[in-house]
Amino acid sequence: MKKPVVIGLAIAAIVAVIAGGTWWYQSRQDDGLTLYGNVDIRTVNISFRVGGRLASLNVDEGDTIKAGQVLGELDHAPYENALMQAKAGVSVAQAQYDLMLAGYRDEEIAQAAAAVRQAQAAYDYAQNFYNRQQGLWKSRTISANDLENARSSRDQAQATLKSAQDKLSQYRTGNREQDIAQAKASLEQAKAQLAQAQLDLQDTTLIAPANGTLLTRAVEPGSMLNAGSTVLTLSLTRPVWVRAYVDERNLSQTQPGRDILLYTDGRPDKPYHGKIGFVSPTAEFTPKTVETPDLRTDLVYRLRIIVTDADDALRQGMPVTVKFNDEARHE
């Protein structure tokens, strides 16, 4: 065989191999499902649980935030005063409860007994005086008004005696169970108010709930804030999720736990890796923000893909291409 013919056959063979390889690669790529999504935007609005004057903010927009970091504080003074008042309330309620449990001292019982004797003497005198007035009334020596005054004095003395006797009886038998229970309930209420005052004072310090990046600083020190007013907005950096949508005919390929490749414009040849973490059980129309070659009237299912090797280059809101082909199993 002549040399030019051999060279021609070799070139033809090489071209055929390249064409076949290209066809095989493209068919392999085309066989896999491709979706389009975005890195999920996950934010937290941070606020105080109590209101007051903002005393300080320790962070600014763009700062990296660590969970547990002190972000700012309200003016403590009103809540410190409330705490002192609550502590005093507990002391008063505790003393009253202890007094109810201890009962009455011997000196108090003796004083109550003396009061009964004094009231008894006053009643006896009033009763005897009334009896004499009755005799005089019968002989028409006194007026009806004098008799009525004597009866009124007797009745008042009798009521005073009854009150003194009841008090002495209470002192001797101790406090009633109902009174003790009421004092105990008052003590528990005071303790609950103290716990709330302590919590309110603690809540004047703003603590970061998670790691992230500070997006917005909505207020400045000196502002008067209501409870729950947004002070800062935090962008959560971990974990990184990608939101994508799949139509019903491809839904069977999106089993939770399946490995996924994620491509970005900045790293077209170096994909991120992820796993399907969640498939929505309900269908919805394709959101306007999602890139798709299909009609938006199609019903789709939302996917949450957890990125397993995320880095700082993968930013929230960034568009990504999601591939389900066999490469994900071999990367």
From Swiss-Prot:
Q: Indicate yes or no for the key word Glycosyltransferase.
A: no
Any one of the GO BP annotations: response to antibiotic
Its recorded name reads UPF0194 membrane protein YbhG
UniProt entry keywords in alphabetical sequence: Coiled coil, Periplasm, Signal
What family does the Swiss-Prot or TrEMBL record give for this protein?
Belongs to the UPF0194 family.
According to the record, the signal peptide region is: 1-19
This entry carries the following GO cellular component terms, namely:
periplasmic space
| InterPro entries cross-referenced by the UniProt entry | CusB_D23, UPF0194_membrane_YbhG, UPF0194_transport
Q: What is its main location?
A: periplasm
Q: Any coiled-coil ranges, and where?
A: 140-209
Q: Where in the cell is it found?
A: Periplasm
Question: Which SUPFAM superfamilies does its entry note?
Answer: HlyD-like secretion proteins
- Identify the domain of life: Bacteria
